[in-house]
Amino acid sequence: MLRMKLTIPRSLRLFAGALLISLTTVSTQAQDWAKARLEASPRHHEYVALHHGSRTVQAFVVYPEVKGKVPVVVLIHEIFGLTDWAKEMADELAAKGYIVVAPDLLSGFGPNGGGSSEFAGQDAAVEAVSALDPDGVLADLDAAADYAKKIPAGDGKIASIGFCWGGGKSFAFAAHRKDLSAAFVFYGPGPADVTPIAAPVYGFYAGNDARIGATVPGTIAAMKAAGKTYDWVTYDGAGHGFMRAGEDPGNTESGNVAARDRAMTRLLTLLGELKSAPQASNSGVNPIVGGKKAAPAACHPAGNSAAM
């Protein structure tokens, strides 16, 4: 038998090694800016184990530095899992005066029974999130909301907020959970059946997001037909994921930055109204189905749908 020995030149081996290190660095450091902000936060962070049935879900919890009781926000992560950005977003909301509970919905599904942080890369996390059982996700979110209701520093109001995949889950959770005070949906689709929804739903969408944008007219029609409160804004010039991309120092799209700033202002205004209002509900109130498109530099509503 003829055997051949392949000798790889040292220069090529060094190049391949450098390339591997570079790719690994890009993957692992993609959210280093979010991690740095999180580590610099003065707020109290903790992980809690949420139990339901035979399952345990780890949740990241952040407390604001305020006096008095405040609403609790259940934050639902993107399709990438509970990343440093998701936790940094939770901390940002806490900085504005809200308790935030962010469950890791990949708890127990990672390598060695771990969660989001145990996956080797983004693709593996995306695949795992995509494979999650929808009913199991709702059960995990129920555990998070049940915990939120019992937090002594909470005022009894809970709201859900989700991004990307989590945006769709926030909408679905509103159709599942009757005691939500509000649901905030960032670039996520609506559920197949909106009739059980009992809380007002607020949508935040990107103008340059054809996949999700194509679902919005159907959602508007369904919410209107069911007599539900649904208030939405589409931010022209922004792409899917603008809340994360808009604060990423490496982002080069000005539309994402503008959309994030304005969406954050809107979100905080709505949360502020929630804080000062009695328990919100879609039951027994006059339904409102309206929205607008927000141009990159100005926002001028014109009825239920405003073109810029």
Identify the meaning behind each predicted range.
Residues 2-16:
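Bacterial N-terminal signal peptides that target proteins for export
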Residues 15, 20-50, 57-60, 299, ...:
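An N-terminal hydrophobic leader/cap segment in hydrolases
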Residues 34, 38-41, 46-150, 244-252:
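Serine-hydrolase catalytic machinery in alpha/beta-hydrolase-like enzymes
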Residues 105-109, 189, 238:
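Short beta-to-alpha linker loops that shape the active-site pocket of alpha/beta-hydrolase fold enzymes
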Residues 141-198:
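Primarily recognizes the serine-hydrolase "nucleophile elbow" in alpha/beta-hydrolase
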Residues 203-205:
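Short beta-strand/loop motif that positions the catalytic acidic residue
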Residues 208-213:
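Acidic catalytic loop of the alpha/beta-hydrolase fold
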Residues 224, 229-308:
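C-terminal catalytic histidine-bearing segment of alpha/beta-hydrolase fold enzymes
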